[in-house]
């Protein structure tokens, strides 16, 4: 059992991401936006906002972005000649002695100021979130597909030393990072407990047995959920937060359990004399996908949420399919592949849906691990490692585009988005 636990930690620690994906470009004219910043009050802070905002708008795939300093009064005639549609001006304002991040959005076509958005500067290191919220305001003005996912927090476990990991929060670019659980213990596998991101589950390896705890960020309080010999991990939370799927091993071999957060009861829903782990909700929380060695090697199965329900094998390609996440009827998983031309084992991300046998390859090289869907299912974050880099990866499924955000001086054990 100890071997299984170490194996699970180890495989999730095989960090990987692809430098780039094949980019499929369609011929389209994106609205041009010029992002400017003011040097008044706090030029350095405004410049940071400016850089993150410009990058967010580029990442969205909805804008043709250029950057500039504040040019004073808006010269609409000149901007129209340059075929610029919008100007976003970021600045730092001071009101009643308090600093505020401010966005002014100008519509060049109508020659008007159309939006003013203020974001309080509660702490200087929170500037990425101010910029992410500004990007959402600009995007919503054009009624483009939502990019609200940009303002979500990432919760992750980071290695500190032998037997020690801390839990931290970050923005999606990893510019902002803050440790919130530091106790010289093994704190691993964090998983958001609700859509509001005010609570999360995680496993703490105590004196003898691993324990699943729920932590309230605002109150800094803990609640004991479950414990089990050898293994105790929350792998999925239902859309309303009322149920969770856990991998527990009270009798030696791990199985998937369904936990009711209101009744505080757990029900065993797999019974196999082998390994059943990593259950994730499917089909509006009516069924689950999970990883099992029923095929003699790790593979993906699905079943309804009942002990007597039969399990159905989902994949018949590959000899090691694991590390999964799901959104409605879509499943993203890690597939271990043959050695590449450099003699390295490749771990790639693949995407499948329940109503199609088509397997969509999402990465092409390196070690790509821990895929996590965004809350709208349109994007995937993951960890990527190659000999040249270690980064947080982002895949925009609608645009066949990917981005990498370098991870410097941090090694991630697990994360949730």
UniProtKB/Swiss-Prot annotation:
Secretion signal span: 1-16
InterPro entries: 6-blade_b-propeller_TolB-like, PD40, Tol-Pal_TolB
Predominant location: periplasm
Pfam families: PD40
Role summary: Part of the Tol-Pal system, which plays a role in outer membrane invagination during cell division and is important for maintaining outer membrane integrity.
Similarity annotation: Belongs to the TolB family.
PANTHER family the UniProt entry points to: PROTEIN TOLB, PROTEIN TOLB HOMOLOG
SUBUNIT field: The Tol-Pal system is composed of five core proteins: the inner membrane proteins TolA, TolQ and TolR, the periplasmic protein TolB and the outer membrane protein Pal. They form a network linking the inner and outer membranes and the peptidoglycan layer.
Protein's UniProt name: Tol-Pal system protein TolB
Record organism: Helicobacter pylori (strain HPAG1)
